[in-house]
Swiss-Prot record:
Glycans are attached at N103, N213, N224. GO terms for molecular function: serine-type endopeptidase inhibitor activity. Gene3D superfamilies: Alpha-1-antitrypsin, domain 1, Antithrombin, subunit I, domain 2, Serpins superfamily. Keywords: Glycoprotein, Protease inhibitor, Secreted, Serine protease inhibitor, Signal. It is found in: Secreted. GO terms for cellular component: extracellular space. Residues 1-25 form the signal peptide. The keyword Cytoplasm does not apply. Belongs to the serpin family. Its main location: secreted. It comes from the Eukaryota. This is Serpin A9. InterPro entries: Serpin_dom, Serpin_fam, Serpin_sf, Serpin_sf_1, Serpin_sf_2.
């Protein structure tokens, strides 16, 4: 085939299957060893940019999907795009890395990829009480001649697996890729590809799977089977509502008029549930930033609190090829694309960037002893100092403490809508 051959790149970005508090036993036998502090490890070079990108992408998704559940994995999408940038050249590369929030004046390209290398290894490290697995895989057209440097770097830096695929038989290739993703997400994400064609040159898949236990699980006996949840459009649906009275980190952002609840998972992960005041969801969404998240993290105080959180399962799918160009990644999706770092024998451009996430939240989990050095006001368990009920639309953020990465970010508009 000559240099004028045109092939498509299919980017399946971050197919996510987070399952919160569902484990009844620990999948690992040993705690992970202590990781270096963020000031000393390479992930500190990429995590701040990843967080900024997280909120910018959320704001774009919320703007284009009003009144809908929002759910995605920022760290997975960032990792996919950073890996793709290894094969990009000229403006194509610059647009990808700048949209991810990197300023070449402050951080070099090798440092960026070294940071992602550490990030991927850290997130995949075994932790007692949680299972988090993130991986990348490239399905390559069998006759495509790839640059050896690109293959070496995606394997070394991002731990990517590489498979040769016969895309001339699109139906068979599609079935094999779908089967792979379904297996890696333990059946949570199915049929991710539905429109594969024979002009495909490469399919890049990034998948992430998460299971964890609450350190303070809910009792199923306390779940109200039918609790009213007020949707933003004014109608009401009835959902199972979990509740418990415990010591949690809690605070109120008076500037935004929202309440923030932090719930910890075993294995160095935390969840933030953010409840806006009446009519203030849009204001909250516009104000999301890395600085705001740091402010919340530092200001929360431990207190006895009665918590009501719906039990729910939601999912969301996005065609990011319509979103990312609006954020600055333009050339990758048009005839100006330069992926000559992947192959010099064919012209490549990204034809599709798909993302799907599935989220389950329930009561079940393994009980664990609470150990904290945070200052605690001693109160009777029967007289909680505060009550917070997530009976209206709210935001949820899941963070990995070791890398300070936003693993999942979403908005629950309707707990009953998958």
């Amino acid at each position: 085939m000559g240099s004028s051959s045109f092939y498509r790149v299919l980017l399946l970005v971050g197919f996510c299957a987070p399952i919160f508090c569902m484990l009844s036993s620990n999948p690992y036998n040993q705690e992970s060893s202590h990781l270096p502090s963020m000031k000393k490890n390479p992930a500190s070079q990429v995590s701040p940019s990843n967080t900024r990108f997280s909120f910018l992408l959320y704001q774009r998704l919320a703007q284009e999907n009003p009144g809908q559940n929002i759910l995605f994995s920022p760290v997975s999408i960032s990792t996919s795009l950073a890996m793709l940038s290894l094969g990009a050249r000229s403006a194509t590369k610059t647009q990808i890395l700048r949209t991810l929030g990197f300023n070449f004046t402050w951080v070099s390209e090798p440092t960026i990829h070294m940071g992602f290398e550490y990030l991927v290894r850290s997130l995949n490290k075994c932790h007692q009480g949680r299972e988090l697995r993130m991986g990348s895989v490239l399905f390559i057209r069998k006759e495509l001649q790839l640059q050896a440097t690109f293959l070496d770097r995606v394997k070394k830096l991002y731990g990517a697996k590489v498979f040769s695929e016969d895309f001339s038989n699109a139906a068979t290739a599609q079935a094999q890729i779908n089967s792979y993703v379904e297996k890696e997400t333990k059946g949570k994400v199915v049929d991710v590809i539905q429109d594969l064609d024979s002009q495909t040159a490469m399919v890049l898949v990034n998948h992430i799977f998460f299971k964890a236990n609450w350190t303070q699980p809910f009792s199923t006996a306390n779940t109200n089977k039918s609790f009213p949840f007020l949707l933003s459009k004014g109608t009401t649906v009835h959902v199972p509502m979990m509740h418990q009275t415990e010591s949690f980190a809690f605070g109120v952002d008076k500037e935004l008029g929202c309440s923030i609840l932090q719930m910890d998972y075993r294995g160095d992960a935390v969840a933030f549930f953010v409840l806006p005041g009446k009519g203030k969801m849009r204001q909250l969404e516009k104000s999301l930033s890395a600085r705001r998240l740091r402010k919340w993290s530092r200001s929360l105080q431990k207190r006895w609190i009665k918590v009501f959180i719906p039990k729910f399962s939601i999912s969301a799918s996005y065609n990011l090829e319509t979103i990312l160009p609006k954020m600055g990644i333009r050339d990758a999706f048009n005839s100006n694309a330069d992926f000559s770092g992947i192959t010099k024998t064919h012209f490549l451009q990204v034809s599709k960037a798909a993302h799907k996430a599935v989220l389950d939240v329930s009561e079940e989990g393994t009980e664990a002893a609470a150990a904290t050095t945070t200052k605690l006001i001693v109160r009777s368990r029967d007289t909680p100092s505060s009550i917070i009920a997530f009976k209206e639309p709210f935001l949820i953020l899941l963070l990995d403490k070791n890398t300070e990465s936003v693993l999942f970010l979403g908005k629950v508009e309707n707990p009953r809508k998958m």
